[in-house]
Swiss-Prot record:
GO molecular function, one term: (3R)-hydroxyacyl-[acyl-carrier-protein] dehydratase activity
GO cellular component, one term: membrane
Any matching Pfam family: FabA
Protein source organism: Methylobacterium sp. (strain 4-46)
Name of the molecule in the record: 3-hydroxyacyl-[acyl-carrier-protein] dehydratase FabZ
Locations listed in the record: Cytoplasm
Catalysis: reaction(s): a (3R)-hydroxyacyl-[ACP] = a (2E)-enoyl-[ACP] + H2O
Length: 165
């Protein structure tokens, strides 16, 4: 990837505000997940370590639609929660970008207050709106909402732990 205003220059430090968006290649640098479990296609906004908006384009080609459900495909709610968690993980990784320190993993630790409001179907574009509630050392807590066309489809509170090996 060629350096641009949104990418860090090799060998330099990047502050949280410098990473404002991320295409799929940048998302793959931030997160360890890969197909079929990478559930964030793009980051359209990162505001320091306080909030982030991730995008997931849902297509019928995804493996979960083979069995969930063949005649009426619905994107599994647990994958909406995982997408929120991955978007939160992008906040953690983007915030800690420096030459010397970066978490090697961000582990999902807690999921609370989960509600599924409306089904998500192939053709939908999901926006994951994540907001940091607080953090203590390596533990971070977030409030998330998944929206399709501005309509709330799911919400959750998520706790994560950053691990540096």
């Amino acid at each position: 990837m060629e350096p641009d205003a949104k990418s860090p220059t090799p060998g330099t430090t990047e502050t949280p505000r410098e990473l404002a968006t991320a295409d799929i290649l940048r998302v793959m640098e931030l997160l360890p997940h890969r197909y079929p479990f990478l559930l964030v296609d793009r980051i359209v906004e990162i505001d320091g370590d306080s909030s982030c908006i991730g995008i997931k384009n849902v297509t019928i080609n995804e493996p979960q639609f083979t069995g969930h459900f063949p005649k009426v495909p619905v994107f599994p709610g647990v994958l909406l929660v995982e997408g929120m968690a991955q978007t939160a993980g992008a906040i953690c990784c983007a915030h800690t970008l420096t030459r010397d320190t970066r978490p090697s993993r961000v582990y999902l630790m807690t999921i609370d207050k989960v509600k599924f409001r409306k089904p998500v179907v192939p053709g939908d574009t999901v926006e994951y709106h994540m907001r940091k509630l607080t953090n203590r050392r390596t533990m971070w807590w977030f409030r998330g909402e998944a929206k399709v066309a501005g309509t709330l489809v799911a919400e959750a509170e998520i706790g994560a732990m950053l691990v540096t090996e």
